[in-house]
């Protein structure tokens, strides 16, 4: 009997399965064999060159050429929209059962290619093996979970009342909008592209994906899975290229019926304000976070420090859910900082492809500069407890490596307000849970938050009063990070999200649909 495949999630704390590592090493070698190739856009079932090309180089070592990619144009986007509009009626008429069958086949292909795709992602954006493998697993599980939620809801087709008249037949049916644009980020290049594209297609829409240029290779892997699973021509289209042209055309073209964007608040809110022109159109934007953890005097400080460390420094802090600010009750502040610093200084930082690394590089020089500027401000205005340096020894000089950094600052400091997307966490002492919650809520964002307390009343107050969409209590695997499809819904409040509904949840697919009432009289 074959042993079940080990499931890797973001909450997986152990990485000592030797068979897993052997499989990953083989997949990584396969991924390395794909480096340096040229990849085209994909429109209406055909590969297409662009207006020149762009290169993607690994943040691990910029001597590594991940690939060369066709640079899409506004005209390419227009052709992709036209193809998607032509394909949409037949894709809808195919029926939801067949659509789900095709997309679930794509999930199986992603799982079967987990080691290779995880290796590609690790090289392309600098994830450690466990982070990369977890994300590939998440992408496949997103398809499976969204399919299950649709099936459990009879694909949103429900009879309504007839007020006692047997001749009247009424139904509520959810129908697709048409064509969706998906603009995905570099930091979760597979999960945050597969999630919205699969949900849109399940709903009967067709899709144009524009990935972050830094993660174009992962988008090619997604294309392979959809194409090999049998997604028809024109239903899924891929246009790579700059946000100023490809992204702008997707936002401005009236042939787009809905848009999904994951990225910065500035860009996301600009899309939200300007996307609807003649009439409202669905605009699903996830715009990051400045996520707080609260550590109270009753907390297990070992557990709290572990959770904060993992949430602050996993994928070098480049998660919208990363823990970047911590409010600690004053009596335990110094001890908590001591334990957190001790754990942080034990982390292995370096090339993420070998097994020992916990932190790899940040994505580019801009991220290095942002980290270094924050460190300079912390040195000027507070205390740098540990870290803060750029790492340039040997081969690290060819990548973008910085030390995980823990600082102490006044809670009014701008580094408690602004999202950094770097391995940097600020800690401040507070006098009460009331003060901690007030400070936590006094922020533009409202994505995730965590608390550590052994007092049930404190936990309940936190759950009732915190203004964020994803809450964690006493979580060693991550104070503010690690949501999983069907386990934790993931969506932001305030400046972190636009719809009030979350990804990874039972409500997600319905956001790609619109309600229609049918009344038929015999």
Positions of PLM-derived features:
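Conserved C-terminal structural/oligomerization subdomain of aldehyde/semialdehyde dehydrogenase
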Residues: 1, 64-67, 92, 96-97, ...
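ALDH superfamily catalytic-core signature
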Residues: 258, 266-411, 433-434, 438, ...
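Glycine-rich loop-to-alpha-helix module at the N-terminal edge of alpha/beta enzyme cores
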Residues: 57, 62-157
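Hydrophobic face of amphipathic alpha-helices that form TPR/SEL1-like repeat modules
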Residues: 1-66
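Rossmann-like NAD(P) dinucleotide-binding subdomain of oxidoreductase/dehydrogenase enzymes
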Residues: 122, 152-303, 430, 499
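Structural signal for hydrophobic packing residues in well-ordered secondary-structure cores
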Residues: 88, 92, 107-114, 118, ...
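Residues at or immediately preceding the N-termini of alpha-helices
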Residues: 42, 60, 74-77, 96, ...
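Residue-level signal for inorganic ion chemistry
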Residues: 45, 63, 84, 99, ...
């Amino acid at each position: 009997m074959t042993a079940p495949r080990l499931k890797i999630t973001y909450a997986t704390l152990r990485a000592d399965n030797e068979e897993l590592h052997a499989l990953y090493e083989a997949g990584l070698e396969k991924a390395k064999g794909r480096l340096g190739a040229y990849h085209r856009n994909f429109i209406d079932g055909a590969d297409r060159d662009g207006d020149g090309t762009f290169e993607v180089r690994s943040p691990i070592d910029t001597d590594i050429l991940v690939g060369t990619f066709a640079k899409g144009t506004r005209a390419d986007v227009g052709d992709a929209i036209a193809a998607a509009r032509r394909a949409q009626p037949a894709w809808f008429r195919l029926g939801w059962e067949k659509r789900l069958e095709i997309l679930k086949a794509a999930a199986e292909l992603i799982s079967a290619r987990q080691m290779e795709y995880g290796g590609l992602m690790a090289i392309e954006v600098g994830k450690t093996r466990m982070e990369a493998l977890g994300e590939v697993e998440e992408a496949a599980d997103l398809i499976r979970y969204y399919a299950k939620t649709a099936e459990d809801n009879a694909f949103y087709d429900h009879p309504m009342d007839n007020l006692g008249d047997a001749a009247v037949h009424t139904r509520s049916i959810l129908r697709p909008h048409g064509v969706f644009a998906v603009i995905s980020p570099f930091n979760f290049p597979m999960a945050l592209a597969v999630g919205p594209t699969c949900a849109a297609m399940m709903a009967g829409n067709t899709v144009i994906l524009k990935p972050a240029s830094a993660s174009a290779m992962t988008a090619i892997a997604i294309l392979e899975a959809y194409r090999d699973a049998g997604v028809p021509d024109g239903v899924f289209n891929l246009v790579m290229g700059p946000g100023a042209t490809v992204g702008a055309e997707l936002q401005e073209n009236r042939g787009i019926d809905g848009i999904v964007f994951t990225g910065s608040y500035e860009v996301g809110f600009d899309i939200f304000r300007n996307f609807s022109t003649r009439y409202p159109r669905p605009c699903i934007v996830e715009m990051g976070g400045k996520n707080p953890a609260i550590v109270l005097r009753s907390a297990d400080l070992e557990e709290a420090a572990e959770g904060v460390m993992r949430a602050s420094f996993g994928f070098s802090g480049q998660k919208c859910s990363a823990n970047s600010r911590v409010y600690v009750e004053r009596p335990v502040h110094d001890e908590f900082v001591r334990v957190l610093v001790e754990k942080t200084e034990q982390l292995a930082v370096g090339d993420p492809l070998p097994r020992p690394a916990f932190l790899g590089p940040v994505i580019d020089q801009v991220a290095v500069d942002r980290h270094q500027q924050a460190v300079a401000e912390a040195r000027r205005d507070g205390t740098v407890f540990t870290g803060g340096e750029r790492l340039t020894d040997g081969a690290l000089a060819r990548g973008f490596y910085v030390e995980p950094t823990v600082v102490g600052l006044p809670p009014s400091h701008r580094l408690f307000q602004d999202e950094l997307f770097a391995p940097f966490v600020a800690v401040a002492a507070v006098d009460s849970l009331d003060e901690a919650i007030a400070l936590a809520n006094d922020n533009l964002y409202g994505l995730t938050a965590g608390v550590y307390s052994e007092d049930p009343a404190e936990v309940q107050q936190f759950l009732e009063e915190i203004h964020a969409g994803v809450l964690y209590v006493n979580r060693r695997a991550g104070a503010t990070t690690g949501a999983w499809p069907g386990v934790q819904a993931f969506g932001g409040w305030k400046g972190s999200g636009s719809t009030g509904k979350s990804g990874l949840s039972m409500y997600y697919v319905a956001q790609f649909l619109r309600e229609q009432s049918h009344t038929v009289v015999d």
